[in-house]
Amino acid sequence: MYQVSLFINTWSKTPTTITFEDFFAMVRNGHWKVPTEGHRSCLAKDRKHDAQTIKDSMACVIPAGICKNGHAKNNLTSLSLALCIDIDHTDEQTKDIFVRACLLEYVLGAFISISGRGVKLFIRIDIDGVNDYPAIYEATAKLVSTVLGVENDGKCKDITHPCFGSYDPDAYYNGDAKAVNDFLPNGALTPRVTYAPVTSAPRTTCTPTSFSNGHPPAMPGNRISAAPFVQSYLT
């Protein structure tokens, strides 16, 4: 588990397999700093077309797992046991939402989106296969909306919906996050059916050479902690 496909852009068909640790290290260490700052600058100047052009050429991951030959649903070959909750248009509440999200035990990771106006959450889940995904996504989206008091973008209900890279030096990762299943209301999930599940990939680490610029990926089971940022924000 915890392995995902990284595409150089949304129309690429040849992904690289990385871990969530790798992805969050890239978000933190500035791997996508230049395009992220360019995108945000264009948005601030109301240059929407230029901003979208930058975003369209941005690398993205498939939080649900590993894909082959594209990222359509039928390209998914193994599960990461995580899902993405996309909270958009947070504006002045962005930092507050990020801080509170980092305190949730089932949050595997959190970071400020490429626009700087939203928060991406990766949530740990426990499912047997792709047929279980719609129910747990719907229940988790409702839970997060209730706990954080915000609406979320329903696009992530599609299991292979891509998540763009970003630059956030305070990005949070907790490899020991608990499965959200235990935090959902009774009856939120329907009984599971028996079928041949999509397998979960072995938990190994693939370290891109780009990590040599100052922030190595966390080892499996460790946290990339947002505590310093949280403390400075609350004081």
Annotate each PLM feature:
Residues 29-32, 37-41, 45, 74-106, ...:
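Modules that initiate DNA replication and primer synthesis
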Residues 23, 50-54, 180-184, 211-212, ...:
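Extended hydrophobic/Leu-rich segments
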Residues 1-81, 200, 206, 218:
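DNA replication initiation on ssDNA origins
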Residues 109-115, 153-158:
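Short beta-strand
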Residues 7, 63, 86, 111, ...:
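Residues in well-ordered beta-strands of folded domains
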Residues 11, 127, 147-195:
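Catalytic "initiation/cleavage/transfer" segments centered on a nucleophilic residue
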Residues 63-67, 116, 159-160:
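Short, glycine/charge-rich beta-strand/loop segments that flank catalytic centers
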